[in-house]
Design a protein with these regions (language model features):
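Surface-exposed repetitive/solenoidal architectures
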Residues: 1-199
Length: 199
């Protein structure tokens, strides 16, 4: 459980200026519980444009739960499965969390999944919001979630989303496949260039 607000500004110079290394990855996903208890992590930097599963958490799965946490002033860059909080959520839950800051996905074509809260959702998200400035020249981008294949309830997005070149771009989600979104909305500004598919 988190007990104070955390100033993560120093992460900008970590790991040869690549910044924070996400908690959980494809070989060792995060499967535990993190309760922010209403506190924030401020100014975290993760500058990893050639890596996947980027965010505070990279890959969260197998019943894991992240709750009651704010991520503010984040600067995030990754290839695919990129989010302000979590890169990818799989059979896990996020509740009462929010993100602000900037995010960029560098993956090619539709393989760059990126969203203000998380890049790809195959779990459950409840009572969360995101206000991020999100951009990618290629990819599936959403103000809240990039690629949604799970459940989202009582959540919203603001901020702005900019995509181009064969991308799918949405104010709330970039792509929604056989998935449930309830009592949620977006006020994000969406800008599409070239032959992007806006929504």
């Amino acid at each position: 459980i988190q007990t104070v607000d955390i100033d993560a500004s120093a992460t900008s110079s970590w790991h040869n200026n690549n910044g924070f290394s996400p908690i959980g990855n494809i070989s060792t996903p995060f499967t535990g519980t993190y309760n922010g208890d209403g506190y924030k992590i401020n100014n975290i930097v993760s500058n990893r444009p050639n890596q996947n599963y980027i965010g505070l958490f990279g890959l969260v799965q197998n019943g894991a739960k992240v709750t009651n946490l704010g991520i503010t002033g984040a600067t995030i860059s990754g290839k695919t499965n990129v989010g302000g909080l979590t890169g990818k959520l799989l059979n896990a839950t996020i509740q009462n969390c929010y993100t602000t800051g900037t995010l960029e996905a560098t993956g090619y074509n539709w393989y760059a999944h990126a969203g203000g809260l998380l890049g790809k959702n195959l779990g459950t998200i409840e009572a969360c919001y995101s206000s991020m400035s999100i951009s990618s020249d290629h990819g599936i981008l959403g103000g809240f979630v990039g690629d949604n294949e799970g459940t989202i309830e009582n959540s919203y997005a603001t901020g702005d989303v900019t995509g181009a070149d064969q991308g799918r771009v949405g104010g709330f989600v970039g792509d929604n496949q056989n998935a449930a979104i309830q009592y949620s909305y977006s006020k994000a500004a969406v800008v599409c260039n070239d032959v992007a598919h806006p929504g």
